Amino acid sequence: MSHDSEPQPVTAHPAGPLTGALKPPGDKSISHRAMIFGLLSVGETRVEGLLEGDDVLRTAAAVKALGAQVTREGEGRWRIVGVGIGGMQDPVGVLDFGNAGTGSRLMMGVVGGQPVTATFDGDASLRKRPMRRILDPILKMGAEVVSEAEGGRVPLTLRGPREAIPIRYELPVASAQIKSAVLLAGLNAPGTTTVIEKAASRDHTERMLRLFGADVSVTPSGEGGHGRTVTLTGQPTLRGTDVIVPADPSSAAFPLVAALIVPGSEVILRGVMMNPLRTGLITTLIEMGADIERFDEREEGGETVADLRVRASRLRGVDVPAERAPSMIDEYPILAVAAAFAEGTTRMNGLHELRVKESDRLAAVAAGLAANGVGHDIEGDDLIVTGNGGPPAGGGTVATHLDHRIAMAFLVMGLATRKPVTVDDGAMIATSFPSFRPTMLALGARIEDGAAA
């Protein structure tokens, strides 16, 4: 959604049981990376199950602008003919990433390690998001910021070096985006690039580097072996390959929690990625008493996937440890909704990273809970939600701040509250889950345009 579009309010009404089976959309993290590795490889990459949301399509457009041939061959089926490491061209015009934080940050790593100059921009939400943590290591690797908005934000122009400088970099926070940007820049560095993280973050970039033929090693490190040291040998020849994109656990979270909180529901989610660095929400919900059955486990696109059977459940409050945050950072809004229906108090610890997402997600979630009569508190970077085991009042209007996950989380809430819940704008849902409404309607949900009457 562009920052000058008219808001499109959407309202969710209390629904009867949700039933049926669905395949959630392709994983957004892997879809971005499949496009980017298609650009950086030699030869042809074919992708199946690509998430065709606005975020990923912006990355596809950037990949094409940097010199790759990009062709859509059918629903979710794409063909990329890459230019190889060092073979990119300066794009004509600005790389407009819309709302895509992941796409823009990963591509800064790509541009920051290659002999190319590009200008990055985005919508009103992306223009507020900090890029300095991405830029800091890339500048150490030889990139140069030609111009930037205040505070290292977009719009900014980045010029990469002829060859990147290999570095050893310790991440200031657990962030797959920073780690990936350094590794992507390191692809054009002679020698070894090393990234050290105190807590393991999503490892999709490391897995995809291996899939395309790079020499990358990952070893446990740090206190208790919870950290990781990732070592990449630079200037490989990446070879185009086939990528099957598994279903996105962050998108699956919305119908999954809906099935838990709408009485009498039973829903099957097919082909959901079960990467242990992405399943913190499922772990937490099971601790809360959720009836989630995992079956038919298999491998797809270098990742483990499984089908999930989810039944309506009585949930109880739990304490969610801060170290689980990297494995579920995008799922806290929908976890807060589940917690609103649970008996007792749920405490989500260490949510600082939520303050620098598409919105200040911590503040946005708290405001949404308040608007719908849910007891909650913020202590430092911890969110505390208190439920009574029954449905909250609902009846509120939630300010989404152009954040797709806030919009979907509170629409799910409205399917089981006593009164309908309205979100002030549902247009940006297309960034990650374009089929959200038809998918939910097919299960029996009632979601309508406009504010509640």
UniProtKB/Swiss-Prot annotation:
UniProt key word Amino-acid biosynthesis: yes
A cellular component term, taken from the record's GO annotations: cytoplasm
MF-aspect GO terms: 3-phosphoshikimate 1-carboxyvinyltransferase activity
Gene3D superfamilies from the UniProt entry: Enolpyruvate transferase domain
Active-site residues, record numbering mapped to chain: 330
Positions with a binding annotation for 3-phosphoshikimate: 28-29, 33, 175, 177, 330, 357
Keyword NAD attributed: no
Compartments, record wording: Cytoplasm
Its EC number(s): 2.5.1.19
Enzyme class: transferase
InterPro entries cross-referenced by the UniProt entry: Enolpyruvate_Tfrase_dom (IPR001986), Enolpyruvate_Tfrase_sf (IPR036968), EPSP_synthase (IPR006264), EPSP_synthase_CS (IPR023193), RNA3'P_cycl/enolpyr_Trfase_a/b (IPR013792)
CDD domains the UniProt entry points to: EPSP_synthase
GO biological process, one term: chorismate biosynthetic process
Pathway entry: Metabolic intermediate biosynthesis; chorismate biosynthesis; chorismate from D-erythrose 4-phosphate and phosphoenolpyruvate: step 6/7
Oligomeric and partner information: Monomer.
Coiled-coil region(s): none
Coarse class of the protein's main subcellular location: cytoplasm
Protein name (record): 3-phosphoshikimate 1-carboxyvinyltransferase
Catalytic activity: 3-phosphoshikimate + phosphoenolpyruvate = 5-O-(1-carboxyvinyl)-3-phosphoshikimate + phosphate
Positions that bind phosphoenolpyruvate: 28, 101, 129, 177, 361, 405
Keywords on record: Amino-acid biosynthesis, Aromatic amino acid biosynthesis, Cytoplasm, Transferase
Pfam families named in the record: EPSP_synthase
Family statement: Belongs to the EPSP synthase family.
Known function: Catalyzes the transfer of the enolpyruvyl moiety of phosphoenolpyruvate (PEP) to the 5-hydroxyl of shikimate-3-phosphate (S3P) to produce enolpyruvyl shikimate-3-phosphate and inorganic phosphate.
Lineage of the species this protein comes from: Bacteria, Pseudomonadati, Pseudomonadota, Alphaproteobacteria, Hyphomicrobiales
